[in-house]
């Protein structure tokens, strides 16, 4: 009987120890969860604060202490959309107020979209009646209008770039010093940086044209285009060609490879990101800039049905452009649109 009593007492003690251990574990777990929750709330609040700061930074026109000591950045944005050409210009103007430099400084980032305007057309009056119009070239042009006191000192991108993705960073340091590098990142903790990043699959970016201190031009030109299992050069008249007996003049799309196979810049369009760095003599109060976005189109002409007639390629046959003039007030650090026009049948031609 005594042994049975001892067993019961031991069993009760074991249960008590287990319960106490479980309670301790639960308490520790609850405490840890509480700590984690507090930590999470702290992180969330910190992130929300950072988010608010970013939002406020975007909303505010002036952000102090971005350029060394007492430097300021004033940001402006202008957006112009033209329905006729289906082209959108979105320009960011960053005024850099640097007390250690004797000139005004401005970074202009040219963004927006140039829609592809891909079209399949029927032209019954021609033997090669089925047409495909596709964007073979995209152009962005920036120039200072009749003002020698404002100069272009640098640009991104430079030269020729053939990679599918283009990434570059421009950095400005106090005293008018600037630098640009490939990739995304800052070169100095005391500098103000601006990045560009865009996709150009199967196209090449070339900084060409009248590039000088008042004019810069970028061309994004089709190269070897891949669609499905095919790869053909932009100069090949068999590009996107499909010889099928079911193609008719009423269904021109059937004379060409399925459009969902086309590269993104052919199928959808191009989203530019180009940067210009300018300086201005402080005696000059206002400067006008003319910005032109252009879409060049090649036309591929196929004959429907069974035949032996070769397709026809006409390069840069069509084009649409949007030209906008912006005026910068250097003293008040403001920008406004003073003129805008667009037109068809105006492909960009160098020279």
UniProtKB/Swiss-Prot annotation:
Biased composition (Basic and acidic residues): 30-60
Chain residue ranges for the region called Disordered: 29-71
Protein name: Uncharacterized leukocidin-like protein 2
Domain of life: Bacteria
Keyword presence, Ligase: no
Signal in keyword set: yes
Family statement: Belongs to the aerolysin family.
Signal peptide (from-to): 1-27
Pfam families per the UniProt record, alphabetical: Leukocidin
GO biological process, one term: cytolysis in another organism
CC annotations in GO: extracellular region
This protein's UniProt keywords: Signal
